[in-house]
Regions:
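Sec-dependent signal peptide recognition
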Residues: 1-9
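N-terminal signal peptide c-region/cleavage motif recognized by signal peptidases
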Residues: 13-15
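Beta-sheet-dominated interaction scaffolds and their linkers
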Residues: 17-40
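Exposed beta-strand and adjacent loop surfaces of beta-rich binding modules
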Residues: 38, 50-54, 96
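Asparagine-centered strand-capping/turn motif at beta-strand->loop junctions
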Residues: 42-49
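Short beta-strand and strand-turn-strand segments in soluble, beta-rich domains
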Residues: 50-54, 58-72
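Intrinsically disordered, low-complexity Pro/Gly/Ser/Thr-rich segments with frequent PxxP/GP/PP motifs
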Residues: 65-93
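Terminal connector regions
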Residues: 91-128
């Protein structure tokens, strides 16, 4: 019975689309500022109900790691791609594990909360 319920839930959830962020394991590149590195990323929006995505960097325990980017919240229209750069201090690079984008669902009166999605890329490669 439990397996059947799990299959029904998976079939119901499967059509829900999220967003895509590439690459999954980005290359760390030097930036034009000494002591700072750059990560080049790209995001594609599959969701017609979401236009904004927040960028975050986390350590292995999901604590925030300081970073800089042109916009901490990106506007990405439906079926469009947006390229962005994230800058980290070399001193924080060993701590930084995940670079994530989270969909920002617009709050509306009288409308039930929609699903928010978070996609993460791993900054330290395949290291555990």
């Amino acid at each position: 019975m439990l397996t059947r319920a799990a299959l029904i839930i998976m079939a119901w959830v499967a059509p829900i689309s999220a967003h895509e962020m590439t690459p999954a394991y980005p290359k760390i590149k030097p930036s034009y500022v000494s002591g700072v590195v750059k990560v080049e990323m790209s995001i594609f929006n599959y969701r017609s109900d979401v236009k904004y995505y927040q960028i975050n960097v986390f350590d292995a325990a999901w604590n925030s790691v300081p970073f800089s980017t042109q916009y901490k919240v990106l506007k990405v229209k439906h079926s469009e791609r947006n390229n962005f750069d994230v800058y980290l201090r070399k001193a924080d690079l060993k701590r930084a594990v995940y670079l994530c984008t989270t969909s920002k669902v617009k709050k509306q009166v009288g409308v039930k909360t929609l699903v928010s999605s978070r996609i993460c890329s791993r900054l330290n490669g395949n290291k555990p």
